[in-house]
């Protein structure tokens, strides 16, 4: 994937959480057969990539042992790969899980610690010549920030010195993201990860205030200027739901309307992202997000559009 002159439609990456305590689907796809059925559904609806995760990263979630995480994700990856050539991403920050997943058929590592959580991860990615999503993780950069305290600890040990953490606390969010990516990309280069195999994720929803989330989304073009494709996850994020609540919309996921509103609002954000040329969006409800991508991409790629043959509508 290249971020230069992006003349392709935004890729839709469908989410499959094989966890008993997942962020928004309640562990619905924890069982192998259910996960495989969900994969088929997402592909049929238009996903050309699937993101498989075996450890929840939601606020209040618990650490999953490496072997347990491997047992959750590897059978699912093998089963999907057996019947489809869809791109498969493994959502993990642990190098041993990534190694097992890549061996099972995954193509890409989605590391929410941005290569900062496990020092062996850059080498695993480099050796496999795999692609990697490097996510900006404000929770790691500002662990004492009020927006970070509700999240679990990410990574083995501490990625930054106490002096760095103290400096990070007062940085504007754009500067903090720049500092984080500078360190993460240096690790990638040192390990020998090819630049063309790197995607950047602005970390929407991780230890950010409402304003910070909105600023990063508004300025995605600035992130594109770094020369890497963008991988974006905004589906069912809390700040999107909060905006709906503040404006009187039903958001209770136990109601049909509330659940639908969450996905509709998320799809609106996807439309904005696709209009800005974001390369990949990570979503739960592929059908609604595909519609958003098709319209937004058509507008963005208007110069390449063909005129309709109106005779076909007679």
Curated annotation (Swiss-Prot):
Catalytic reactions on record: (7,8-dihydropterin-6-yl)methyl diphosphate + 4-aminobenzoate = 7,8-dihydropteroate + diphosphate
The organism's place on the tree of life at top rank: Bacteria
The EC number(s) this enzyme carries: 2.5.1.15
Gene Ontology BP annotations: folic acid biosynthetic process; response to antibiotic; tetrahydrofolate biosynthetic process
UniProt keyword annotations, A-Z: Antibiotic resistance, Folate biosynthesis, Magnesium, Metal-binding, Transferase
Enzyme class (EC, first level): transferase
PROSITE patterns cross-referenced by the UniProt entry: DHPS_1, DHPS_2, PTERIN_BINDING
Protein activity control: Is potently inhibited by sulfonamides, with Ki values between 25 nM and 850 nM.
Listed cofactors: Mg(2+)
Pathway annotation from the record: Cofactor biosynthesis; tetrahydrofolate biosynthesis; 7,8-dihydrofolate from 2-amino-4-hydroxy-6-hydroxymethyl-7,8-dihydropteridine diphosphate and 4-aminobenzoate: step 1/2
Pfam annotation, one family: Pterin_bind
Cited SUPFAM superfamilies: Dihydropteroate synthetase-like
Binding site for Mg(2+): 17
One Gene Ontology molecular-function label: metal ion binding
Record's GO cellular component terms: cytosol
Family, similarity comment: Belongs to the DHPS family.
General function of this protein: Catalyzes the condensation of para-aminobenzoate (pABA) with 6-hydroxymethyl-7,8-dihydropterin diphosphate (DHPt-PP) to form 7,8-dihydropteroate, the immediate precursor of folate derivatives. Is the target for the sulfonamide group of antimicrobial drugs. Sulfonamide drugs act as pABA analogs, they inhibit the reaction by acting as alternative substrates, leading to a 'dead end' sulfa-pterin product.
Protein name per the record: Dihydropteroate synthase
Species of the source: Streptococcus pneumoniae (strain ATCC BAA-255 / R6)
Gene behind the chain: sulA
């Amino acid at each position: 994937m290249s971020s230069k002159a992006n003349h392709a439609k935004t890729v839709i990456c469908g989410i499959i959480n094989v966890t008993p305590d997942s962020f928004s689907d309640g562990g619905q796809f924890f069982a192998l057969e259910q996960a495989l059925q969900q994969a088929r559904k997402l592909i049929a609806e238009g996903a050309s990539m699937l993101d498989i995760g075996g450890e929840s990263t939601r606020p209040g979630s618990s650490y999953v042992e490496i072997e347990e995480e491997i047992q959750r994700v590897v059978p699912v990856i093998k089963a999907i790969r057996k019947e489809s050539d869809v791109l498969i991403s493994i959502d993990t920050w642990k190098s041993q899980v990534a190694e097992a997943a890549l061996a099972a058929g995954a193509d890409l590592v989605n590391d929410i610690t941005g290569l900062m959580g496990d020092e062996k991860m850059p080498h695993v990615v480099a050796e496999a010549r795999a692609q990697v999503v490097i996510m900006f993780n404000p929770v790691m950069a500002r662990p004492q920030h009020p927006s970070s305290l509700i999240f679990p600890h990410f990574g083995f040990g501490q990625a930054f010195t106490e002096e760095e953490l103290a400096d990070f606390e007062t940085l504007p969010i754009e500067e903090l993201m720049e500092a984080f990516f500078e360190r993460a990309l240096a690790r990638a280069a040192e390990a020998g990860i090819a630049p063309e195999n790197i995607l950047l994720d602005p970390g929407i929803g991780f230890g950010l205030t409402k304003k910070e989330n909105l600023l990063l989304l508004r300025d995605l073009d600035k992130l594109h200027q770094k020369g890497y494709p963008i991988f974006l996850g905004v589906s069912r994020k809390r700040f999107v739901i909060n905006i709906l609540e503040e404006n009187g919309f039903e958001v209770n996921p136990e109601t049909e309307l509330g659940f639908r509103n969450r996905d509709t609002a998320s799809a609106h954000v996807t439309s904005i992202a696709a209009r800005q040329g974001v390369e990949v969006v990570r979503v739960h409800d592929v059908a609604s997000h595909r519609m958003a991508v098709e319209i937004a991409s058509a507008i963005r790629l208007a110069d390449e559009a063909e005129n309709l043959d109106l005779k076909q509508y007679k």
